[in-house]
């Protein structure tokens, strides 16, 4: 598995807290499209199809 970048880990951490894309964008001072791209990359690196699956897989792998 390709490692997550620091920013991807930040986004994943916020996803695990239940934050929406707009909340993540606001907190990290990013555009919503950039957040969506990070979520897409996270899912690809974890080999999953959804943000919920990404959270479950990240927890099972103790990524955060």
Residue map of PLM features:
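Helix-turn-helix DNA-binding segment
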Residues: 1-40, 60-63
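Basic, Lys/Arg-enriched C-terminal extension of HTH/homeodomain DNA-binding domains
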Residues: 44-64
């Amino acid at each position: 598995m390709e490692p997550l970048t620091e920013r991807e880990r930040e986004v994943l951490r916020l996803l695990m807290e239940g934050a929406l894309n707009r909340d993540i964008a606001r907190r990290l001072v990013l555009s919503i499209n950039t957040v969506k791209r990070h979520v897409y990359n996270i899912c690809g690196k974890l080999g999953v199809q959804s943000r919920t699956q990404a959270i479950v897989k990240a927890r099972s792998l103790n990524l955060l």
